[in-house]
Amino acid sequence: MPVVTLPDGSQRQFDHAVSVMDVACDIGPGLAKACIAGRVNGELVDACELIDSDANLAIITSKDDAGLEIIRHSCAHLLGHAIKQLWPDTKMAIGPIIDNGFYYDVDLGRALTQEDIELLEKRMLELAKKDYDVIKKKVNWQEARDTFVARGEDYKVQILDENISRDDRPGLYNHEEYIDMCRGPHVPNMRFCHHFKLQKVAGAYWRGDSNNKMLQRIYGTAWADKKQLNTYLQRLEEAAKRDHRKIGKQLDLYHMQEEAPGMAFWHNDGWTIFRELETFVRTKLKEYQYQEVKGPFMMDRVMWERTGHWENYGEHMFTTSSENREYCVKPMNCPGHIQIFNQGLKSYRDLPLRMAEFGSCHRNEPSGALHGLMRVRGFTQDDAHIFCTEEQIHREVSSCIKMVYDVYSTFGFEKIVVKLSTRPEKRIGTEEQWNQAEESLAAALQENGVQFEYQPGEGAFYGPKIEFTLHDCLDRAWQCGTVQLDFSLPGRLSASYVGENNERKVPVMIHRAVLGSLERFIGILTEEYAGFFPTWIAPQQVVVMNITDSQADYVQELVKKLQDAGIRAKADLRNEKIGFKIREHTLRRVPYMLVCGEKEVESGKVSVRTRRGKDLGSIDVNGFIEKLLIEIRSRNLHQLEE
């Protein structure tokens, strides 16, 4: 006689085993209709799962995050159902959920076209609208294998042979004549899977191994209702308009080419943004009392073996050799900073020592994972390492947190999700060290009024960490900032200082990054602002245009005056209509366009327009420069008169 306890504390008693769906029906028809799955004693299960002993139960609906994930997973099965109807010889591989959707890897024997994708989506919708029940069967390993051997599903057979124990009872989900294998849970009926969209097809190696066959990965998105789907598709459309690769080309910021995959060729305007970003960060380094250093581009492989990087990260490192020595191009800056720390005797009075670098790093990322500036092989880290005592951890972490929020607020990022990752099962250091470290990080966050969530067991083996994930205007998440404690690396590389009692002690090292990678952060900013960079960081801040040749000298004089004031300005003296010039520079997102005609020459003023189309009228030149300099120096996000 199971007693089922619901989330509100109420209980229902049954005189026999009941399914999750039975309990939902007992509560009411509305909940039964909405029931997708259940959470029994904390574990997600199918709606058909039997409860035969006392249990805690939460009914999962499409309003729950878990419910939406289940809908997406079932849409992957729906895709499999449709593709096997259209192309029966297709071999199905894996079909997991991902952020906002799902994919399925398939072996079709030919490349899918856009027409194929449209046909596939149409068939999926036809099947979903039949509102058929999804039937789950738990079978023994041999029956599952026989099922997929008979169906010619080689990849499913391989999964069974290599990844599933002979003692397991795999779950087979029956979608009419189509059968798929999955841990589940899945929707009980396809009425939950009406709102989806297939998005794209890409290549993917079986099991992610380039030695295996290349499969086709079909991506899709799925939502609980039509409104959610349309909202997401509109967001995707807006994201496509803001794509930093597209805008980077339009604004002539940078380019990539095959001869240097994952490494940017910065053009003048893009490099201007890069240098402005560096200058801004340098002001913060000075404000927060950091030294700026520069380590070597590469070091002997022996160094990376000592740090443990070669063993754990070697496949992602570029190497070269000279005079029978093997060198590794650095993927990160920390070992170099410890070498600088080790030069000369250090006392506890020298700590904390804050060391920052705009380090040029390289990582051998897979070519298929490269994506504009967001995923590169060559990048610049705004990296810093703080060497301190255990007693100084709290204060230093608190300072790092302040710096992170200080920087992000300058760019207008307000939604920042913070996570504190705590000790993993396998770790170094004493329990006392971990207790103090975790308490110091949590206290520093609380001291700064930062809301955060714990990620138990997700810290590195050498120390806990804080992750800062900023959300952009489209609510996309970008993990940028980190504050990571390290009890291991300083000791591995023989870093030490003399304590108060003249004993040798190993410093704690705090790894700290704010922007992460400058390249990636510029990509994020490009998409956040859609290329409308705040004036202080805009590559061209002002363009001055003449209407006829008679204003050319006045324009040149004005440009020189602007440049002498430290404003990035240029002249446009082309023999084109003024409307054409304005349209062109508007498309180039130049913050201010100054128009000079006879009236302006006579009055010594300028006619000012913004890139958003606002006409600020005729303004005194000196007054305009004064206001513009205030906007630039304050790093204001808004333009004059906005």
UniProtKB/Swiss-Prot annotation:
Residue positions binding Zn(2+): 334, 385, 511
All copies of domain TGS, residue ranges: 1-61
Cofactor note: Binds 1 zinc ion per subunit.
Gene Ontology CC terms: cytosol
GO molecular function, one term: metal ion binding
InterPro entries, A to Z: aa-tRNA-synt_IIb, aa-tRNA-synth_II, aa-tRNA-synth_II/BPL/LPL, Anticodon-bd, Anticodon-bd_dom_sf, Beta-grasp_dom_sf, TGS, TGS-like
Keywords from the UniProt entry: Aminoacyl-tRNA synthetase, ATP-binding, Cytoplasm, Ligase, Metal-binding, Nucleotide-binding, Protein biosynthesis, RNA-binding, tRNA-binding, Zinc
Reaction(s) the record says it catalyses: tRNA(Thr) + L-threonine + ATP = L-threonyl-tRNA(Thr) + AMP + diphosphate + H(+)
Enzyme Commission code(s) on record: 6.1.1.3
Cofactor dependence: Zn(2+)
GO terms under biological process: threonyl-tRNA aminoacylation
EC supergroup of this enzyme: ligase
SUPFAM superfamilies: Class II aaRS ABD-related, Class II aaRS and biotin synthetases, TGS-like, ThrRS/AlaRS common domain
Gene3D superfamilies: 3.10.20.30, 3.30.54.20, Anticodon-binding domain, Bira Bifunctional Protein, Domain 2, Threonyl-trna Synthetase, Chain A, domain 2
PROSITE patterns associated with the record: AA_TRNA_LIGASE_II, TGS
Keyword match Aminoacyl-tRNA synthetase: yes
Highest taxon of the lineage: Bacteria
Major site of localization recorded for this protein: cytoplasm
Family: Belongs to the class-II aminoacyl-tRNA synthetase family.
Function summary: Catalyzes the attachment of threonine to tRNA(Thr) in a two-step reaction: L-threonine is first activated by ATP to form Thr-AMP and then transferred to the acceptor end of tRNA(Thr). Also edits incorrectly charged L-seryl-tRNA(Thr).
Name of this chain's protein: Threonine--tRNA ligase
Organism: Photorhabdus laumondii subsp. laumondii (strain DSM 15139 / CIP 105565 / TT01)
